[in-house]
Design a protein with these regions (language model features):
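Polytopic alpha-helical membrane-helix bundles and their juxtamembrane interface segments
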Residues: 1-24, 72-74, 80-168
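Long, highly hydrophobic alpha-helical transmembrane signal-anchor segments
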Residues: 14-46
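Hydrophobic alpha-helical membrane segments of integral membrane proteins
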Residues: 30-34, 50-54, 143-147
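Transmembrane alpha-helical core residues of multi-pass small-molecule transporters
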Residues: 35-38, 57-58, 148-151
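Alpha-helical transmembrane segments
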Residues: 46-62
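Membrane-water interface of transmembrane alpha-helices
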Residues: 57-75
Length: 168
């Protein structure tokens, strides 16, 4: 059995981040910054440029921004973030920027000859959705991460079939 330690550590950090996020704890965002760096390195090794660009160029900066907004907007008990209700303007911005992000990154990934380009592009879209909703302090962020997890399972199944590595 061939286990990649970096992938194992990244998975543990990522899962821990999601647990803290579910509790509305700002440590979720700090762990997401660390996870983004680890995941960027793993993605680079597999030439999954979309994943690398997404996590280092979008998820990590959004996690930094979310750390700031979460610290500035604590709930009344002071232990978690105050949830913000999504408004129509948030949904419009989400759809507009999500569409632009998807189109732009599809072409970037095509130029970089990214393997599994369709799933890589969908992963960028779902990552954007999750990061944007997290930054907005919306409880719907988990929906974005759940969609992204489904896409990532498919994407990394392709990678493991190609490289015959066992990740977990």
């Amino acid at each position: 059995m061939n286990i990649d330690i970096l992938t194992l550590v990244a998975a543990c950090v990522g899962i821990t981040s999601l647990v803290f996020a579910a509790k509305g704890n700002v440590w979720a965002q700090i762990l997401m910054i660390i996870f983004s760096i680890l995941y960027g390195i793993i993605s680079w090794r597999f030439h999954y440029w979309g994943e690398m660009i997404t996590y280092l160029g979008m998820t990590m900066p959004m996690a930094i921004w979310s750390t700031i907004t979460w610290l500035k907007n604590p709930a009344k008990n002071g232990k978690e973030v105050a949830i913000q209700k999504l408004r129509l303007k948030h949904i419009v911005w989400l759809m507009l920027f999500g569409t632009i992000t998807t189109i732009v990154f599809y072409y970037i990934l095509a130029v970089l000859n990214t393997p599994n380009i369709v799933f890589s592009t969908i992963s960028i879209t779902t990552s954007f959705l999750a990061a944007f909703l997290t930054m907005l302090r919306s409880s719907y962020y988990a929906f974005g991460y759940a969609l992204n997890d489904i896409v990532l399972i498919i994407l990394w199944m392709f990678a493991s079939l190609k490289n015959r590595l066992t990740y977990l």
